[in-house]
Swiss-Prot record:
(6R)-5,10-methylene-5,6,7,8-tetrahydrofolate binds at H51, D169, A263. Pfam families: Thymidylat_synt. CDD domains: TS_Pyrimidine_HMase. This is Thymidylate synthase. Its EC number is 2.1.1.45. DUMP binds at R21, R126, R127, R166, S167, C168, D169, N177, H207, L208, Y209. The active site is at C146. One of its GO terms (molecular function) is thymidylate synthase activity. It catalyses: dUMP + (6R)-5,10-methylene-5,6,7,8-tetrahydrofolate = 7,8-dihydrofolate + dTMP. Pathway: Pyrimidine metabolism; dTTP biosynthesis. GO terms for cellular component: cytosol. It comes from Citrobacter koseri (strain ATCC BAA-895 / CDC 4225-83 / SGSC4696). Catalyzes the reductive methylation of 2'-deoxyuridine-5'-monophosphate (dUMP) to 2'-deoxythymidine-5'-monophosphate (dTMP) while utilizing 5,10-methylenetetrahydrofolate (mTHF) as the methyl donor and reductant in the reaction, yielding dihydrofolate (DHF) as a by-product. This enzymatic reaction provides an intracellular de novo source of dTMP, an essential precursor for DNA biosynthesis.
Length: 264
């Protein structure tokens, strides 16, 4: 994960001070890309411990089309609590857009099922895309999508994915995002009998919050360790049938966790 630390340093060295929606203040750069070869290890940050339980359960929650935090709470995941209303609802966030994008004619489009069918039946298509950025529903969402648009690409029997993230909290959010989409690529590759290729991350407003500077310098002082390996223990009938216990990370030996406040 050397490229992640290099991004942190780049934001420190080249970032512009900007105000933001949360009132916290950031150092920000615009436009950055990282590429992770998923055959060389699972891209889970090692310079601090990442909460893998939250990453896995959040992705499974997205894939079910869920937008209420009840499932997350049942599994001791609290990462969405700050944005939920008193009933645990978040509005039409990621899960709704992935699984039930509302069309003008009243249909609801399941983008994940569409993508799975494309990967199996038309893998050379240049339209294997999922978007969470539904302009007509942004004002109903508790939080507008940060990781907003992703595309799959098949070549030489390998499945790759590129994500466009319009807003990126480099210290807290980005390690989750990288691991989550890497996990999704592994799951989709298994379902389609493909090998994994690359995960390409592209960031728009890529920033460090002003109250994460001490933590960032601490993390930069640490030496990255070997990447772990993801093991998927079974092949379910569909992309929607995975369970938390299907996943195991082997050889994850991170430095201790580093706490930091969330900008809401």
């Amino acid at each position: 994960m050397k490229q992640y630390l290099e991004l942190m340093q780049k934001v420190l060295d080249e970032g512009t001070q900007k105000n933001d929606r949360t009132g916290t203040g950031t150092l920000s750069i615009f436009g950055h890309q990282m590429r992770f070869n998923l055959r060389e290890g699972f891209p889970l940050v090692t310079t601090k411990r990442c909460h893998l339980r939250s990453i896995i359960h959040e992705l499974l929650w997205f894939l079910q089309g869920d937008t209420n935090v009840a499932y997350l709470h049942e599994n001791n995941v609290t990462i969405w609590d700050e944005w939920a209303d008193e009933n645990g609802n978040l509005g039409p966030v990621y899960g709704k857009q992935w699984r039930a994008w509302p069309a003008p004619d009243g249909r609801h489009i399941d983008q994940i099922t569409t993508v799975m069918n494309q990967l199996k039946n038309d893998p050379d298509s240049r339209r294997i895309i999922v978007s969470a950025w539904n302009v007509g529903e942004l004002d109903k969402m508790a939080l507008a999508p940060c990781h907003a648009f992703f595309q799959f690409y098949v070549a030489d029997g390998k499945l790759s994915c590129q994500l466009y993230q319009r807003s990126c909290d480099v210290f807290l959010g980005l390690p989750f995002n990288i691991a989550s989409y890497a996990l999704l690529v592994h799951m989709m590759a298994q379902q389609c009998d493909l090998e994994v290729g690359d995960f390409v991350w592209t960031g728009g407003d890529t920033h460090l919050y002003s109250n994460h500077m001490e933590q960032t310098h601490l993390q930069l002082s640490r030496e990255p360790r070997a990447l772990p390996k993801l093991v998927i223990k079974r092949k379910p009938d569909s992309i929607f049938d995975y369970r938390f216990e299907d996943f195991e990370i082997e050889g994850y030996d991170p430095h201790p966790g580093i706490k930091a406040p969330v900008a809401i």
